[in-house]
Amino acid sequence: MVSIAFYGGIPGGISTPITQQSEKSKYEENTMFQPYCYNNDSKNSMAESKEARDQEMNLKEESKEEKRRNDWWKIGMFLLCLAGTTGGILWWYEGLPQQHYIGLVAIGGRLNGSGQSNAIECWGSFPGCRPFQNYFSYETNRSMHMDNNTATLLEAYHREITFIYKSSCTDSDHCQEYQCKKVNLNSSDSSNSVRVEDVTNTAEYWGFKWLECNQTENFKTILVPENEMVNINDTDTWIPKGCNETWARVKRCPIDILYGIHPIRLCVQPPFFLVQEKGIADTSRIGNCGPTIFLGVLEDNKGVVRGDYTACNVSRLNINRKDYTGIYQVPIFYTCTFTNITSCNNEPIISVIMYETNQVQYLLCNNNNSNNYNCVVQSFGVIGQAHLELPRPNKRIRNQSFNQYNCSINNKTELETWKLVKTSGITPLPISSEANTGLIRHKRDFGISAIVAAIVAATAIAASATMSYVALTEVNKIMEVQNHTFEVENSTLNGMDLIERQIKILYAMILQTHADVQLLKERQQVEETFNLIGCIERTHVFCHTGHPWNMSWGHLNESTQWDDWVSKMEDLNQEILTTLHGARNNLAQSMITFNTPDSIAQFGKDLWSHIGNWIPGLGASIIKYIVMFLLIYLLLTSSPKILRALWKVTSGAGSSGSRYLKKKFHHKHASREDTWDQAQHNIHLAGVTGGSGDKYYKQKYSRNDWNGESEEYNRRPKSWVKSIEAFGESYISEKTKGEISQPGAAINEHKNGSGGNNPHQGSLDLEIRSEGGNIYDCCIKAQEGTLAIPCCGFPLWLFWGLVIIVGRIAGYGLRGLAVIIRICTRGLNLIFEIIRKMLDYIGRALNPGTSHVSMPQYV
């Protein structure tokens, strides 16, 4: 049975019946009801429109967030696939046979503490030399031998080290192809005229067979020994020796030298060794069993001579050639006498470096008897593994400078240890890895570490940037320390020289003083003996001289040398003190520079040092690289979220405070009005139902509107409450609520601030309704006590955001640790389960349920 209990309404509205049903509902006393002045569509819109919009916005934000998460997951998977692909390619490449590989080797340098046996060390003054700094070392206890069956250290050096010095000028035209034809050189015995004839079968002249080659644009024809060239496929095309090697290219050549009669450009000159023969007293005689350094087209046999008339003499020959145009370049012929030359491989041809005051010439020599050699100057070639650039018609070398090679001989007998020191840079060059001795390629764990190489790529980029700065800082620091150290050494040497001079003067003064004392003693003895002044004049004259004491000290003449000594001692003393003071200052500055770390460089070194020390198995451990990959992957996938959260916290701190206070104010306001409204409504219902308020609460969710249908409203009470909280501005004041039972009263009076208990409530309500609020006004209201939490605490919000971000990072770490522990636990459980099953299987096998073995019966 349905009975109508109350008709209520508002002025201008539709009277809405409030009905009661006998159906029971849950008792909720804090729920507020408003008169039904709308139809079902209006009620649905009023109760659900805001919630629907909020849900739609939340869904959109979740969709965007999910999409971003998916995007970063895709990026992470892409990096993982890229690492796997790169690792696979490197793994495949590792399996291929490699004759050469690119290694990091420094160019140039000198030997330090080498114990070099009978070797000439040519360092420092070479053009293009760069110093070494402890890059690699080689040790052996084998001595030098002339036996072909013994591998010496210099031969190992030849096989391994010298091949790394391969550089070329970018503008060099040395290694081009030449069109050459074989010719004979015939001379008459009575004259120095030599004819050039085109023949098929060539004969030797001056110890060599000859080629006539046309250079670029057929503008120049060169007459060269056949030993300098290499034929290509039995054709008329020839190339110089050494051009089939692998070359590293440099951008410019540092110096020009005179090559024969031609000014050439030397790109990079590496160090080389030449050996002095054993048991030879004359240190100017150099043997020819050094390593192959490819100075020009030098063969395995080589030597160095000083260019003078006693060693080599120029043979002036006239070369006659018919029918040629342009430039015809002929070699220079020498006759040389070399003593104590022993061929390393019993070959007749040797290479000789002949250096003079302003030039260096490279000779090819052929032994025609025991000591006499016929030599020719090389026309072109490779000097010290560097291309030579010959002048062309439209290209000239300007500002020529010539280099002198200063060599010193080390007469030690054992070749035990050498080390390359003082390096300023590392250059990637091809290095052979097939030889049995010498510099050997040490493989790093590259099978599985092919994947490792891809994994650590990102870390290598950051490490390279950090370490590059560290290296530059350290290099600058070392250079400064070296400069100060050199100043200290120079000052110390100068001070020692001055002290030595002072000591010499002081010693002379002491001797002279001793002589004077001896004279005084003698005079005293004469006075004591004779007590006569005249007798003293018969003795040695007591004179104050300044000359050093010697055997004839009694015959010195009086002079002012002593005063000069004193003056010099004072001057030297001042110079010594000044020099030593400067040395002390330089030494102190050197120590300060060396011990003062650069903050950024020190941070970089400490950072990567801690990373390297923390990761287990530093070296070849695969665990290190796996952990590093996980850290990099975590950083790549988490850093965008962290940065985005930080941006949200910093950019939205101001508006967040306004929204928070707005929400708190409306919540408090709504709570007061809800309590008062509910009390008024209870009083009204008590008058209608005869005091049976409980009966109303049991049926309050069963109210129907004028047509008896309120199912839509009854099913969504929580949505109605949320809608009321969201639309705080639609709330009506206490006075308006009271007007429900008094139709015709004005509703907007309270909204204008004329009613209410709080005089600031109306203005604050309008201020909060403005979008975003006003931080300054919020602070004013907070000081007046009308706000619970001030919105001007931006540092607090920022700090809280940072705490959240740090917590998020810690959360990632803890979750990762939890995953690792879970995986380890599963692995241990699997191992224990396998062990259990094995033991159970073995136990069942040894103790079957039914025995098939009959035990023997004893009767």
Curated annotation (Swiss-Prot):
Start and end residues of each stretch annotated as Fusion peptide: 446-466
GO cellular component, one term: viral envelope
Gene Ontology molecular function, alphabetical: structural molecule activity
Side Cytoplasmic, residues: 636-859
A Pfam family matched in the record: GP41
Ranges per topology, Extracellular: 7-614
Modification after translation (UniProt): Specific enzymatic cleavages in vivo yield mature proteins. Envelope glycoproteins are synthesized as an inactive precursor that is N-glycosylated and processed likely by host cell furin or by a furin-like protease in the Golgi to yield the mature SU and TM proteins. The cleavage site between SU and TM requires the minimal sequence [KR]-X-[KR]-R.
Annotated TM spans: 615-635
Immunosuppression: annotated segments: 498-513
Single GO BP term: symbiont entry into host cell
Propeptide: 1-6
Protein name: Envelope glycoprotein
Organism: Equine infectious anemia virus (strain WSU5)
Gene name linked to the record: env
